A protein has these predicted regions:
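A solvent-exposed interaction/effector surface
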Residues: 2-220
Length: 220
């Protein structure tokens, strides 16, 4: 089981197509055989700018006050789909990352959380239809990303969720400081590790870009 956990990074999303490839090409994506691939555009000591192509995901949405409660329900629903809960009864390979879309909100407000599993390469063209009407296919456009250092926050706990959100807010300030253009009101978290993984976790936060992302050498 892949779950969001420990993350510090942020990405810009644009428009274009994503490759699903062998995880051996990505040292930090080592718990599944296939991962979402990317091209490194530029980097600094703190950030990487990446490009991803578009790819097909299987997604579901859950509404809750707490992200961790919504994520748990959404994960179980999606896992049931890849474990045979589809019209073919087919078991589908787990991939990474697991993606979750989070809408900005006040702590006490309910919000929609949309979780997505990346479909493996062999199921990109014609995946089996879900038997649960709450599970849908989504084609996400290609995107560029900013990637920064990581921490080991556990998003399964409420305290760590607070920490994660504070880091997200910090990166928003960083984006604004370089006059980056991005869509407001939501962001994405990408998780690469099982909840059983205690060390060397790797997770990221994504923001959707509007226009070309700014490379580190353009910040000076």
């Amino acid at each position: 089981m892949i779950y969001l956990s420990g993350l510090l990074g942020f990405l810009f999303m644009l428009t274009a197509e994503a490759g699903v490839g062998n995880s051996s090409a990505m040292p930090f994506c080592s718990e599944t055989e296939q991962c979402l691939m990317f091209d490194l555009i530029c980097e600094s000591d703190e950030y990487e700018v990446r490009h991803y192509d578009s790819v097909k995901w299987v997604s579901t949405t859950e509404r809750s006050i707490f992200m961790e409660m919504a994520a748990m329900k959404a994960f179980k629903r999606l896992y049931k789909y890849i474990d045979g809960g589809n019209e073919k009864g087919k078991k589908i390979e787990m991939t990474a990352p697991v993606l979750i879309k989070m809408v900005d909100k006040k702590f006490w407000q309910k919000s929609e959380y949309t979780m997505s599993f990346l479909l493996p390469a062999e199921d990109q063209e014609n995946p089996p239809t879900p038997t649960d009407s709450n599970v849908k296919f989504v084609n996400k456009a290609d995107f560029h990303s900013f990637k920064t250092f990581k921490t080991y926050l556990d998003l399964c706990s409420r305290i760590s969720v607070f920490g994660f959100r504070s880091k997200k807010d910090f990166f928003v300030l960083q984006l604004d400081s370089i006059n980056a253009k991005y869509s407001k009101g939501f962001h994405f978290g990408a998780g690469y590790n099982s909840p059983m993984t205690m060390f060397k976790r790797h997770n990221e936060v994504w923001f959707v870009a509007e226009g070309e992302p700014v490379c580190p050498d353009e910040w000076e």
